[in-house]
């Protein structure tokens, strides 16, 4: 699968996509910022100019694959690439008084073949100068790079950038843009996790997926003492161009990004993904198939959370299915959605390399009216933690035609917890396992005679305690099969309630079973809605095998 090869490369931060055709547009611009490393011609720049660039670029043909890299860069191993360090003494804002933020650039090489141009902007005068590549900006250490091949390659460009925050101004970055239109940020743990993208195209269609590139960035010079910076980006691909403005707030416990984009379609697009995010789910409390390791859980995110336009909150636990699955959840002007990592307990992961208990959640908050569309969720089978296998995005209902223009505004929260949560009872965890026996007899002296699958969903918060004396009723809807042995159990350690039921098949079908449940008290909903997709085994696997040897 092309997507899998791309994502595997991105684990080494590699992205192989098409080149930009903006050189003539830059040369036609009239473009200075006070920066020791900016050495290009002075040019005028603001967001309206960038929008015009993107609009005009969409009227021209996409130039296709990137040009070849010098051999010394093209053949690098991930280990060699990672040993290249940017010289912190030549950072973008090194000379800013009382700087709280600083920026460094990533070197081209390995899978990073797309030239990305960098510009420094004086926000007061709207003048910019390009920062050209030169080997003296980097420390090559033991990377084995033949720097003679790089002499005179001022147009080589960079692969991306990252931003550091005081007091870790040259040691631990908090924001990173690297590869295609991928970018990431951290919370106060400094632990990277899932990624966002500028745009997704044809993620789940009969066409080959397209990965647009950010091909140029313009940085407003950061103000003394500021923890907020603004960077502009030009996006380019075979089907679309875009002008992006990122206002990024590097707060104490989270990073917040205000994003504004203006998109210009070159071609008809079957599936346009707005504010896409990419994560990894190998196994968790609900999905144990790939957990034959010392780690109880392995995932960057454990659920998709949605706050629908009608006010309903939905929790959709993630899966690692045996077959690729794509689900689309319709909505009208969504209030927010995101891939969340809410389980922060180290003992639930036992991982001192990945530190999954520290990985951030990502929440999207639309800032203008997005209209009708769907939240798409793609879950790809994976054998482990080295491949991102979860994709989520907003797809507008209206088909995209060549020449169409769009504008979206949204806010991204990179934090341990989303900025908002359901005021009703919330899903804490989902567990699945063998069914068909009374709780407390697991499974008893012998296996159950009839096969079933048990589901246990824990709810916490809201007004559960007040509702309990009046009666809590789980409302369960299944696309196939039957729910039996339904129990409501109070769980003192979490001060919440567990809804437990066994699913029994009513046919031999192995089609996914869509499950939906919420809690009701005297006719009123008192919880968010739990959605789940279960994949029944083949009929000949619906039996328990007693493999004990008693003699």
Swiss-Prot record:
Gene Ontology CC terms, in alphabetical order: outer membrane-bounded periplasmic space
SUPFAM superfamilies given in the database record: E set domains, Galactose mutarotase-like
Assigned protein family: Belongs to the OpgD/OpgG family.
The name this protein goes by in its record: Glucans biosynthesis protein D
Listed GO MF terms: carbohydrate binding; catalytic activity
Post-translational modification: Predicted to be exported by the Tat system. The position of the signal peptide cleavage has not been experimentally proven.
UniProt pathway: Glycan metabolism; osmoregulated periplasmic glucan (OPG) biosynthesis
Superkingdom in the source lineage: Bacteria
UniProt KW Calcium keyword: no
Protein role: Probably involved in the control of the structural glucose backbone of osmoregulated periplasmic glucans (OPGs).
InterPro entries: Gal_mutarotase_sf_dom, GH-type_carb-bd, Glucan_biosyn_MdoD, Glucan_biosyn_MdoG/MdoD, Glucan_biosyn_MdoG_C, Ig-like_fold, Ig_E-set, TAT_signal
Record's signal peptide: 1-32
PROSITE patterns named in the record: TAT
Keyword field: Periplasm, Signal
Location of the protein in the cell: Periplasm
Any one of the GO BP annotations: beta-glucan biosynthetic process
